[in-house]
């Protein structure tokens, strides 16, 4: 019969404190994006987060290799993984609502900060200093923040292109607005991506594989 191991004093060892942090993160898959839009395929927050992290990492590499920059790709990608984590608690507030007024935008920002704090507090205390920078997006340079924001917009544009490729004109205006907003950022790394990588998103699988 298995026995519970005991300490030298004979008492059973103390069970480690449990944490809900990653269980909460896993709930991203249940949070839909584009909730006010008619979609041919739904997209959840987990998918968007993973794609944004990939894009952010690539943009940082472009910054370093092609434009002589010094963006920290690993740190930016980690921040991208958590950039929408507060929406686990707040939900994905539609953009027209979030930015309806300056007061609404500021109110949502405060709610977002509170949600970030709640998530951080779910971590075991010794881990909080290590994960805090990624979870709160702290310690990024202005360039790194710009690249992360550009990656977020690129993910939205890619979603629009995917919907348009399926014949869904519901995303025509959103695609134009997101594309204009990205161009207004004057981000050469994103401009390079748009010219070099984005056209392939309109291709079929056979075209992508050269069949």
Residue spans for each PLM region:
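Alpha-helical, largely C-terminal catalytic domains
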Residues: 1-211
């Amino acid at each position: 019969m298995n026995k519970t191991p005991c300490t030298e004093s004979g008492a059973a060892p103390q069970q480690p404190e449990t944490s809900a942090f990653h269980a909460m993160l896993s709930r991203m898959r249940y949070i839909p994006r584009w909730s006010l839009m008619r979609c041919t395929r739904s997209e959840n927050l987990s998918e968007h987060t993973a794609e944004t992290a990939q894009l952010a990492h690539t943009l940082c590499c472009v910054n370093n290799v092609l434009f002589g920059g010094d963006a920290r790709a690993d740190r930016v990608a980690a921040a991208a993984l958590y950039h929408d984590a507060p929406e686990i608690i707040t939900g994905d507030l539609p953009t027209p609502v979030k930015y309806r007024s300056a007061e609404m935008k500021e109110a949502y920002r405060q709610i977002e900060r509170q949600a970030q704090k709640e998530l951080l507090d779910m971590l075991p205390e010794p881990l909080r200093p290590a994960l805090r920078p990624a979870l709160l997006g702290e310690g990024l340079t202005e360039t790194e923040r710009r690249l992360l924001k550009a990656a977020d917009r690129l993910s939205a544009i890619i979603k629009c292109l995917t919907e348009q490729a399926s014949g869904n004109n519901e995303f025509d205006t959103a695609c134009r607005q997101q594309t204009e907003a990205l161009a207004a950022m004057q981000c050469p790394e994103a401009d390079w991506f748009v010219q070099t990588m984005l056209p392939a998103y309109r291709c079929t699988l056979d075209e992508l594989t050269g069949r």
